[in-house]
Each structure stands twice: as structure tokens, then as C-alpha cells.
């Protein structure tokens, strides 16, 4: 686990890039700090499901809903939450699902046709049907009746814990143990570790405008192209001190600039944070940058490109992410391999001529030099750990974290 010195160093390094963290807890009006899920419809209103009820936030005021205020709510532990196109709110619990519409609660359980009371995820397809991922399978509600699917229909063991839809309106679902599931409305197709998926525990899925599937697993991020063939795996979006590299993904989302945001939590280290990908390189954020806590549970990007990160300690909102993320120099600059055993290569295809400083986690400059070619080698004889490259091209300064094994 990173120590305080690492936190302070990386705080000053990343904080200089300009993003803002705003944190919310019970002191601000949140019903409970242990936040499990989040949703928004684009109106600027956020809804959060917690261990002890529901919180609605309009940017100024908080409204809380619990079984004490609304007796129709089946449980205070909210396992899934979704605001629908028509404004209805659906929430999932371990005892069934609830719909809040026109100030009225309606509950659905197995007695009403639900396949399993233990809801994990709720979403809506373009035709207005409600899709409910459950511990034991899938239920689809057409407004009147439920259609249910489970292992006998082809869903692998592990149930459904995430659902997204592609450009062809096929559903892509994450299984708790069985991998990535494609459902065309008739049959299920399974993609698992035999197809290159990093791990068969799939926690989150997001599909981009090229119909690529970004699949968050318990071992990292797998990307399948529009032909559903594995394109790439990412296992170190959020850098950890050696020898730890595991990056379990808890949430995914794209903003309007096509920046990918990834929530990561490594439970055995009690460490976690948020990684951002600009299509070329990763930047990560953690508690040292202002994130409220390491136990990431969900991540939602709203229509204003605000990134809402839910944790067991409260909520962080990330805003004002600077345009450096799409800067040509940064995109063209490669530092590889990273991590390394001590030898790093720096390559830039667009220009040459840099002043580079290598700093340790305390901010001390270990060496400084000038690079005049497009490709250069750096030797780092120091001990294993996290270091920072400060790179200046004469007009701008950039930072890259490097890890020496």
C-alpha cells in the first residue's frame, strides 16, 4: 500500500494539472457514506443508492429516502439504481425491486413474476423495457409482464451484474463468474477467458461509438472490437508499487471528449482510485489528489462531463479536467516499458528536444538531462518504487509516473 510520502508527492504532481475534487458525506446531507451505486438522466440531478437508503442531489439540496420515510421501499440497502427516460426511478434490493413514479412506489418480487429478488443491476433498453440483472439470472419487464432467464436458458453460473447495449441493440451482460454474455433477444453467446477475456468476473461494461466493448473485470480491462474479437487487455491502468499490479475494475464511463474513466479497487491492498485514458496514455487519481476514499464501488459520468465516484467513504465529483489530456505532445510521447527493471525508452514521433528530470516520491531531483533525439534511453539505477518524469519541451511541462520493478 502506498505510504504518505507517495501520496504527498503524487498529490502535488497531479494536482498541478488542474482537476477539481468535490467530496460529499453525511455531513453534507448524504444519507450514508457507504454508497453502492449511482445514476443520472442528464437533468443535473444525481441519485445514489447506499447501505442505508437513497439520496437525491440536485446540485444544492439533498433529499433522502429510507424505509422510515417511505415504508413501501423494500430495503435500505440499495444494490442497483437507475433513473429512466420517462423519469421513473427503479431501485434494486436483495428483496425485490421498487419503482418510484408520480410520487408512488410500486414493488415487484418473485410473486409478481420477477426471476430473482436479489437485484444487482437495472437499466433500460431503447424500446423502454426494464432489464434487471439478478444474482440468479435476468428479468425483462415490458410494463406488464416479466420475461425471465437463468442457467437453464443459457446464462452461465454467476448471474448478471451489468448490462449495456450495442449499436445493433444486442445486450452485453457481465456475469459474476461466467464471463461476458451477448444476448440478441433469442440466444446467448459467451465470451470468457478462452477468448482472451482477462477474468470471467465482469463488473462493468461500456460500449463506445465504434461499437467496441470495454469490459471491466476483476483482473483489469478487456477491449473487444466491433467484430467481437479481443483487441487489447489493460492490466495496469492504476499503477501500484511493485510487485502488485492487479487492477479490478468497478465502474466505467466515457465523457464527451471520449476520455475513458475507470474506477478501480484492489480489496486485498485496501487501495484504489480512478484511472483516465485518452486513447493513448493513462493518468490515475487517488486519495492524495482529493478522492474521498479508496474503496471504489461505482463510477458515473454525467452530461456535463462531471465524473461521480462512489465509495465506502462518500462521493467524489471530479470536474475541470484540463485539455492537456488531448495534447499532441503527450499523445505522441511514449515511455516504455512501464513498469521496467531499470531501463526505460522515451520515444516521440512529433518532435525532439526535451529537458527531463527524474524525481523520487519525495520530490527530490535524482537527475536532469536534455534529450535531442526522437528516441532515447533512460537508466534508473535506484531502488524499486514509483518515480516521476518531469518533461519540458520549452513551452509546456508534462509529467509521467514510471515504476521500477
Which role does the model predict for each range below?
Residues 14-15, 383:
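Generic detector of short, well-ordered, non-transmembrane alpha-helical segments enriched
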